């Protein structure tokens, strides 16, 4: 049996707070036997045609014949029979083997490169827990990236995965060239290297690096410190000869193609020239057109300086693809991004804490606090956030991470970030599968510790609903998540067409996993980036009783749930909360 509360957005309380609804549930953590109750559905309306008394419909749970439920126009809802359900193969296996409480909540993003671009390598990553495959437009050709996208799509279709695709733009910042085709170059201490804007037709001289910015030689000064890839390698400018800049290596390291360059003078970052460059370059616009044509799920924009850039890009995507569900991710990796953080997050569909480049623009000791602040703002504004850059950097060359790296990953999980991202570790590292396994095992262990220790953080989640209907959805999800923790339920079910209510539940970070049922494949893949969500594709109707009965039947047949499991269900079609045991 089930107990439910239904709300209608037609209710109006002129400048009154939301009415406090008494909930007939205990607040202890013991499981609550709801079998003795019948389903209660309430609808109230202030429209002239309705009576002054609310309509109450009562029906037994599990019969599939709960009478007529009404939508906002007081018309009966047409019920359709879902014939199948799509779920990620790895999640299905985890649920069968380990149960609800052992499913991983933190999502994993893998950058695809030469080490992982083959179909078998991609499948190994998907089996290992990859939720999102990232393609970095700084490297490779569009034809190469197209082949990767095709393999990921084939993987989803043939093997039963739901891996989303994120395209990361290059951005307009100053960076190195492609190293003449070499995959990397080693800069040793004391070596003299030349950074030049020349275009070499013949093989370039030894220890010479191209720079993409024509004014580079004019802007740098002798004595400036040049940082490669956020400080992974450092040089001191010792001489300027026309378009060439001679530099001495002061901190040795590995040089990678198209690595970002920043230069410092008298202990401060030289920002003026970068500030004049556009956030989205002409190449980026061509890459964005490519991403739209290929139907990627996310586009990550580098070096975002303001919300205006995000809004412009969203309008551009909408004009080029009116039915597109592409989400825009803002990469927070500059001082300007931090200054305008809240407006950027509000405008975007999510954010990435790009710690490598961010650490080249602010003092290193400020990066941890900046990360925590970005994660917190994203959580408050209900936007997924990815912690990226150098999570397991040593595993590019070694099979085991450093203990400091494990602690760093643990902290990101403890901060309740939505996702963790591998960069070079999976793109060009020698142990991509092992690196992913480390992220997965650390995430599961820290999440389990958090639940065992009852760390229900007291983060204030501000109201974000822009309409009255959105505010009701928000209150429902907040209440459902709190009830789930208090009652110790096994899972939260959410039926959502656009994914909004699923994201609201994810924002609350409940103890139990969230089963998100949606009718659209693209929405399902997008939800795969958000904390705690297990996205399913399922055809459903507006009749919650029918949806639940058929969902129970389909999931029980696959061994993913069993009779007696306690579930709370919400829906963005009929704004409601239902609590029930699986029949």
From Swiss-Prot:
Residues given in the record as substrate binding sites: 134, 356-357, 389
Source taxon at top rank: Eukaryota
Annotated site, Transition state stabilizer, chain positions: 331
Cross-referenced PROSITE patterns: PYRUVATE_KINASE
Pathway note: Carbohydrate degradation; glycolysis; pyruvate from D-glyceraldehyde 3-phosphate: step 5/5
InterPro entries in alphabetical order: Pyr_Knase, Pyrv/PenolPyrv_kinase-like_dom, Pyrv_kinase-like_dom_sf, Pyrv_Knase-like_insert_dom_sf, Pyrv_Knase_AS, Pyrv_Knase_brl, Pyrv_Knase_C, Pyrv_Knase_C_sf
Disulfide bonding pattern of the chain: none
Residues that coordinate or bind Mg(2+): 333, 357
Subcellular location: Plastid, Chloroplast
Single GO term (MF): magnesium ion binding
Protein name: Pyruvate kinase isozyme A, chloroplastic
Organism field: Ricinus communis (Castor bean)
